[in-house]
């Protein structure tokens, strides 16, 4: 990931209290970054404060995903403890989840208007303490912001939702009964950009956008209408929106990164979701394919049971990714997501996790992030902090044990 200055420049566009926040967002010119309410209208517990130095980007990012529930609870401090004692140097924290809710109280007008910051927001003092602690221990904070899968915004602002072809005044619903936003709508991406800008203002060192795609249901193309498509291919739409969003955020000087389906490294189509490797790999500073072996069909890479061969899947998949990136000028850095959860046989443990990591190392890809939807990780798979770097995991020093607390009362986020 590209390095960024120790201090950041935050461009603020102040709008009048009487102006419509949604209308103002639509009127902003490309290149303008944040839109916030005047100070007189901001809650007293606002998190924004004078700029502080951001944690610099590690040469090799080794991270864990922290879901919203984990961030709100005791698990946040446990995961910070993991990062202090192991090779983990980064935490990807849900700033906006796939229900549309924010982690903390926001100054972004649209977020306030739709109540995106009203569902159990993190207390101001706690959010500051989390980011200050991470900064003190040089732990790299990454803000994960879900873009197109936002049922809250789709319900509150129907104009931006995907519509049914038979009833254009009604939103299209996925198999779980949830509406999605239309990727053609610029406002969808401007909203994400505003949230990203705010997150950097709080102290996050990187912006990571997820669900930068169309829904992955084939019936969508029979049941939905896209009046703004204007003949463009889905992959072209996603590319154009990523490039615009990247430009809006460029003044912040932080890495612009995107999560993509793991199968994009091998599939030469857009898979119906608008994600084609050559179309997006140069539209971000970093691309993060979700390389979960359990998500590969039997026979992929001539492997009968991909889930049982994590090294081979990652090795072959990242070889494809590197090869395809070589043909694209200014291709983004590849940072794969690896699987730290069990879906089918075998049960995933330290050996399976290290096998994935070794598959990356053998391709010269030293960065990685582990995904577990509950943010419960296999600590025994991690090297102790300060252990010698090596692609050979046989000499790995075991990490100090960290007691994990199961929290069954907290609903896990759905698998991606």
Segments from the language model and where they lie:
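Aromatic-lined carbohydrate-recognition surfaces of secreted/lumenal glycan-active proteins
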Residues: 65, 140-150, 208-209, 234-273, ...
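Conserved, mostly hydrophobic/aromatic
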Residues: 91, 134, 192, 199, ...
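Active-site-adjacent "subsite" loops/lids of carbohydrate-active enzymes
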Residues: 52-67, 71, 132, 148-201
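Catalytic domains of carbohydrate-active enzymes, especially glycoside hydrolases
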Residues: 77-101, 201-206, 283-286, 360-367
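Glycine-rich, aromatic-flanked loop segments that form ligand/cofactor-binding clefts
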Residues: 88-95, 123-173, 206-209
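Substrate-binding cleft of secreted/luminal carbohydrate-active enzymes
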Residues: 284-297, 307-400
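Active-site-proximal loop/short-helix segments
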Residues: 107, 151-159, 202-233
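Aromatic-lined carbohydrate-binding/catalytic grooves of carbohydrate-active enzymes
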Residues: 86-122, 216-223
